[in-house]
Amino acid sequence: MGRKKIQITRIMDERNRQVTFTKRKFGLMKKAYELSVLCDCEIALIIFNSTNKLFQYASTDMDKVLLKYTEYNEPHESRTNSDIVEALNKKENKGCESPDPDSSYALTPRTEEKYKKINEEFDNMIKSHKIPAVPPPNFEMPVSIPVSSHNSLVYSNPVSSLGNPNFLPLAHPSLQRNSMSPGVTHRPPSAGNTGGLMGGDLTSGAGTSAGNGYGNPRNSPGLLVSPGNLNKNMQAKSPPPMNLGMNNRKPDLRVLIPPGSKNTMPSVSQRINNSQSAQSLATPVVSVATPTLPGQGMGGYPSAISTTYGTEYSLSSADLSSLSGFNTASALHLGSVTGWQQQHLHNMPPSALSQLGACTSTHLSQSSNLSLPSTQSLNIKSEPVSPPRDRTTTPSRYPQHTRHEAGRSPVDSLSSCSSSYDGSDREDHRNEFHSPIGLTRPSPDERESPSVKRMRLSEGWAT
């Protein structure tokens, strides 16, 4: 820190004035010496103080310098105090550096402009490297759903599987379907039955069991996992999909997994909202869990909920109308059904509702193309027909296929319309066909056998 700058005026205190004179006089002589040596010049300094004392300084000899001075005619430069003051004022007005060392920290216009430029460059860098708020998902989230308790669903998402997101974990062994035994004929799924939604083996090896799972609806929306013998590898970024339908539309299917408790099932209006909100992603929703009406449970059929539900399920035409067509927990939710169409489904009779289901499934099979990664082989095996006695031993495995004795119920009509084939193609392709949904039809004699229907009604669905 430099010395404090003092005002150049006469010092009133005698003592201070004497001290200042002594110091500055020596300083002046020192400067004269430096100037004479550095610049090779002759200097003569004559000082009279306030008490008329003489102080002189000469670089060589005072008499010699004074003689030279008297012989000189006209000085080249002659200055007085007024000239020095004027020169100092001009320097300050030009913005030259002040003797005060603190003035170097002053904010000059040039420095302020420099700081402004630095701030602008920093702001531009922040804007250009801004991180996006919602990065697009690039991986599948595996979900394992044990069914030991019907009050809650435990979703286990292992973090380590994010590095290799190609597996859908298998669910509880109670979800295994007894489709390996000869003779169990796959029935066509009804509005809430997903047992035949993907029956068969979708990989080169024979899978033993699979649980309900869901994949990312954006990357690999084409496959849904159902309780069948399948083992599916869903890849993070699928290769170009293989179109399996009539039109080359974008395959948009995703999985809707219902809550575990039957007391917390979403209402019909919530399901309508879910179906309509799914249209923003253009993804018709296909649920893969067993349906459960509020206050009612299903027994015997493997599902993501519990297999310990009671078997007091009974489905009437009024209950079917309350389902709003396909709006059950595992029904086929069509994203194209709007709110007013859902409202009309409430008021339609069962016969008209069954016709609507048949028309809607035909549209679904032709327009909503299920896409599979082209690296996977489609090999769906059909199984031999079982004797009718096997059907009576497990009546509750196909709960929504019960029929009234007078004729087929609307649920059966809905189940028959869930197939991707219509007309005689269903019967012709019963033994060997390659379908992305893997549906098989029962034989006509089994469908029309009243004894089998009565036994199922008496054993599995007695209230």
UniProtKB/Swiss-Prot annotation:
Basic and acidic residues composition-biased segments: 423-433
Modification Phosphoserine occurs at: S59, S98, S104, S220, S226, S238, S386, S409, S435
Region Transcription repressor: start-end pairs: 358-389
Covalent cross-link (Glycyl lysine isopeptide (Lys-Gly) (interchain with G-Cter in SUMO)), residues: K381
Phosphothreonine found at: T283, T290
The entry's DNA-binding region: 58-86
Lineage: superkingdom: Eukaryota
InterPro entries hit by this protein: HJURP_C, MEF2-like_N, TF_MADSbox, TF_MADSbox_sf
Biased composition (Low complexity): 409-422
GO biological process per UniProt: B cell homeostasis; B cell proliferation; B cell receptor signaling pathway; blood vessel development; blood vessel remodeling; cardiac ventricle formation; cardiocyte differentiation; cellular response to calcium ion
UniProt modified residues of type N6-acetyllysine: K4, K114, K117, K232, K237, K250, K262
Molecular function GO labels: DNA binding; DNA-binding transcription activator activity, RNA polymerase II-specific; DNA-binding transcription factor activity; DNA-binding transcription factor activity, RNA polymerase II-specific; protein dimerization activity; RNA polymerase II cis-regulatory region sequence-specific DNA binding; RNA polymerase II transcription regulatory region sequence-specific DNA binding; transcription cis-regulatory region binding
Keywords tagged on the record: Acetylation, Activator, Cytoplasm, Developmental protein, Differentiation, DNA-binding, Isopeptide bond, Nucleus, Phosphoprotein, Transcription, Transcription regulation, Ubl conjugation
Chief location: nucleus
This protein's record includes keyword Transcription regulation: yes
Post-translational modification remark: Phosphorylated on Ser-59; which enhances DNA binding activity. Phosphorylated on Ser-386; which is required for Lys-381 sumoylation and inhibits transcriptional activity. Acetylated by p300 on several sites in diffentiating myocytes. Acetylation on Lys-4 increases DNA binding and transactivation.
Location(s) in or outside the cell: Nucleus; Cytoplasm, Sarcoplasm
Residue spans of biased composition, Polar residues class: 365-380
Residues annotated as domain MADS-box: 3-57
GO cellular component, one term: cytoplasm
Protein task: Transcription activator which binds specifically to the MEF2 element present in the regulatory regions of many muscle-specific genes. Controls cardiac morphogenesis and myogenesis, and is also involved in vascular development. Enhances transcriptional activation mediated by SOX18. Plays an essential role in hippocampal-dependent learning and memory by suppressing the number of excitatory synapses and thus regulating basal and evoked synaptic transmission. Crucial for normal neuronal development, distribution, and electrical activity in the neocortex.
Domain remark from Swiss-Prot or TrEMBL: The beta domain is required for enhancement of transcriptional activity.
PANTHER family: MADS BOX PROTEIN, MYOCYTE-SPECIFIC ENHANCER FACTOR 2A
Subunit structure: Forms a complex with class II HDACs in undifferentiating cells. On myogenic differentiation, HDACs are released into the cytoplasm allowing MEF2s to interact with other proteins for activation. Interacts with EP300 in differentiating cells; the interaction acetylates MEF2C leading to increased DNA binding and activation. Interacts with HDAC7 and CARM1. Interacts with HDAC4, HDAC7 and HDAC9; the interaction with HDACs represses transcriptional activity. Interacts with LPIN1. Interacts with MYOCD. Interacts with AKAP13.
Protein name: Myocyte-specific enhancer factor 2C
Organism this protein belongs to: Sus scrofa (Pig)
Lineage, uppermost ranks: Eukaryota, Metazoa, Chordata, Craniata, Vertebrata
